[in-house]
């Protein structure tokens, strides 16, 4: 999927009532109404890009692995870390067993960033420290776990399969690795007795991309994907093929994301709620991106100017239209079907979601796609209630909006 969603410009349409206290002559034949219905699309809207300090990526069911560098977005490297769980098995001492092979199986998640025509390469390194959650029971896109970079366990090459979630990739691992594990299991060695002993013997794997790669690829993480399977057979009258599966932990896994934006329109972007990067400093565009933590702040600095239209002004309806930059999306890089819109205070601290006028349904943006020229593709939000609430407010009481990818994309993809 496309690296970033860029918003070139937005339109907001207002319809409001204004009541003027105009004096009329006593005894006039007609009484003139002091109410006016006005429609305008000239309300100033300011966009800026914000960057989260880090994102929780532990235990997700999708991960990203790869490397990409270009002039617009900079350099992005995504790696994956996983602890493995030892299976429970018992062997009949009267039967002989022979090792066959050991493999790792991965399934694509279908999403990607970059050139999918180039062969990609991933290396697997043994961890030298155990993966541990923090006090809040999370691991993050910025977490660091040491691994032995001088002694890879294995490496493999593959061709990306964009959009194909069911595509299986099974890679044979070194027999020496498999035989060592198999013999420990046959011997009923202590390291295979429990997860506690096993994780001290084998702390896990770091999946590191080749730095010459041109694509970041998404993979599923579950009991079928990222599993290490040890194949063996029993020597009886009838040879019986068997297998043991070492699954990746459901909690002690995480995605690490590294980036370098030097020389790009976003090189001045710093993390933190108080470090918003104005569109005037980023080619007059605002940006969203999953996993690196970019999202958009939307402000209405001159909203209260509407109050000058009369003594009593009320907003009847207001619609916000957000236009993605042409050329940043298409058949190969589809736009998200939904976006999330939140309210925030003046310090960009998130407060709540934007709902419809009834307050019951959360708005996710009505996506209108121009299939012909792609000039008029936009997301539409009803901001009537939000602007009614904020009209006339100042200072700490004034709210902003935050536009963010939905959680399933923001925390697991580089869309």
Where would I find each of the regions flagged by the language model?
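Secreted, disulfide-rich extracellular signaling modules
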Residues: 2-7, 13-415
């Amino acid at each position: 999927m496309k690296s970033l969603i860029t918003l070139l410009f937005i339109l907001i349409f207002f319809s409001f009532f204004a009541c003027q206290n105009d004096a009329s002559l006593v005894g006039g034949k007609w009484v003139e109404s002091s109410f006016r219905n006005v429609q305008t699309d000239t309300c100033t809207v300011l966009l800026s890009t914000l960057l989260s300090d880090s994102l929780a990526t532990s235990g997700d069911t999708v991960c990203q692995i790869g490397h990409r560098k270009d002039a617009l977005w900079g350099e992005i490297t995504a790696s994956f870390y996983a602890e493995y769980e030892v299976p429970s098995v018992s062997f009949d001492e009267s039967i002989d067993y022979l090792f066959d092979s050991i493999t790792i199986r991965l399934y694509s998640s279908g999403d990607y960033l970059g050139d999918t025509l180039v062969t990609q390469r991933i290396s697997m390194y043994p961890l030298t420290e155990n993966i541990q959650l923090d006090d809040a029971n999370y691991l993050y896109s910025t977490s660091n776990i040491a691994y032995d970079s001088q002694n890879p366990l294995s490496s493999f090459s593959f061709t990306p399969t964009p959009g194909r979630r069911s595509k299986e990739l099974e890679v044979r691992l070194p027999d020496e690795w498999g035989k060592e594990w198999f013999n420990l299991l046959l011997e009923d060695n202590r390291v295979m007795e429990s997860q506690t002993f096993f994780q001290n013997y084998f702390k896990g794997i770091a999946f590191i991309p080749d730095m010459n790669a041109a694509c970041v690829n998404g993979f599923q993480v579950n009991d079928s994907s990222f599993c290490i399977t040890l194949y063996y057979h029993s020597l009886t009258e009838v040879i019986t093929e068997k297998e043991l599966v070492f699954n990746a932990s459901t909690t002690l896994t995480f995605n690490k994301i590294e980036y370098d934006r030097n020389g790009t329109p976003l090189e001045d972007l710093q993390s933190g709620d108080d470090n918003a990067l104005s569109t005037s400093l980023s080619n007059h565009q605002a940006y969203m991106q999953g996993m690196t933590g970019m999202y958009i702040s939307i402000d209405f600095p001159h909203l209260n100017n509407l109050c000058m239209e009369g003594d009593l002004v009320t907003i009847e309806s207001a619609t916000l239209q957000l236009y993605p930059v042409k050329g940043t999306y298409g058949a190969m890089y589809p736009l998200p079907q939904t976006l999330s819109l939140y309210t925030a205070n003046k310090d960009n601290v998130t407060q709540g979601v934007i709902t419809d006028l009834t307050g019951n349904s959360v708005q996710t943006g009505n996506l209108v796609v121009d299939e012909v020229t792609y000039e008029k593709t936009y997301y539409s939000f009803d901001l009537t209630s939000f602007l009614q609430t904020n009209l006339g407010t100042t200072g700490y009481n004034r709210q902003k909006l935050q536009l963010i990818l939905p959680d399933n994309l923001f925390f697991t993809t580089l869309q």
